[in-house]
Amino acid sequence: MGLGDKLPSVDADAFVAPSASVVGDVSVGAGSSVWYGAVLRGDVNSIRIGCNTNIQDGTVVHVAKHNVKGSLLPTIVGDNVTVGHKAMLHACTIEDGALVGMGATIMDGAVVKSGSMVAAGSLVTSGTEVASGQLWGGSPAKLMRELTAEEKAFLNVSAEEYTALAQGHKTEADKSFETLLADMDEQEYLTTRDEAYDISLGVINTSGKKEHADLV
């Protein structure tokens, strides 16, 4: 949805769920996905979502005009990022290949560096920097440990899987009204009882009379 002279820019290969809200100065890159109930509100500043990044269901992404020093505070999310369900990103930067867990909050001016992970439910306070390759958690979030090799590999797998998953949802969401009606007709046909099948079960005889009404 546009807001004044600010219009969202969504790549043709991206998926934005029908119930998601993308408002104002927001760009969404190729292969990225914005899931059901998510809100991206670029009103007083801009939101940039890179490529192959997933913003999962119920997440809120917002911005701030500037901090007390006058520095602009957009929200920038890089490539191959996973943002879990119901996370909150506010005027922050999430670099390439990072993961923000479900229900986590990232506040103004915070930076989650590339290849790092924020645990579910954590609060990353304003101005905090989460270093690459680290796991942070808690409220306020603090360094917990370095990521294992398996966890580092999972960061890429998570983004890849969501990019693939989104394509099926995009195919359905992009269907025309006529195609949806045709799908409904086909589904109705597939759920109709076949007389020959009923005869083979002995539910009806060849005259069409039902023999075992309790089986229908």
Language-model features: locations:
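A positional/architectural concept
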Residues: 10, 14-55, 59-65
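Extended, small-residue-rich solenoid/repeat segments and analogous flexible loops
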Residues: 1-31, 202-216
